Amino acid sequence: MSEAEYLGGRLLLAMPGMGDPRFDHAVIAMCVHDEHGALGIGVGHVREGITLHGLLEDVGIDPGLAPDMPVLNGGPVETARGFVLHSDDWGGEGSVTVNGLCCLSASLDILRAIAEGRGPSRFVIALGYAGWGGGQLEGEMRRHGWYAAQGRPEILFETPTGRRWTQAWKREGIDPAHLVGQTGSA
């Protein structure tokens, strides 16, 4: 793939019938994609039983001014590892810009900043990530497992979690009700 074809900063939308129930109606914010592989954070499903306040308390941070919002299921890899996708108005150590979609941070510094009311203005927090080895995601794309939508911050930060998949399709001009789960050949 050429650099222009890599999917960093895009939203991957799971196609109906992709065959992996872990990714049913998944929305993945793609953070890194190159010849060595890809890493994205799932933003379409809530991790049941975990809220931001509980997560902060688990890592020894007083929730303070943090909103008690759901934590998202970021993916099936390293499910105890936390990631914050956020607006670019906070730039602590280790914060990385993801091609205009958002910034990515994975340090306790951002969690402390959020709890103290000095964090980013917009953010989502997830545990785990989705990862692919070199060429693996490209193969899944060829098999119609994923659709690469434009990376729209309003889908990530303003759309309720359970509506992100449908709204991302609609912003692409596609009615997801018309999608089929299988392809055929003539």
Swiss-Prot record:
This is UPF0301 protein Saro_0683. Gene3D superfamilies: VC0467-like. Transmembrane segments: none annotated. HAMAP family: UPF0301. InterPro entries: AlgH-like. It comes from Novosphingobium aromaticivorans (strain ATCC 700278 / DSM 12444 / CCUG 56034 / CIP 105152 / NBRC 16084 / F199). GO terms for cellular component: cytosol. Belongs to the UPF0301 (AlgH) family. It holds the Pfam family DUF179.
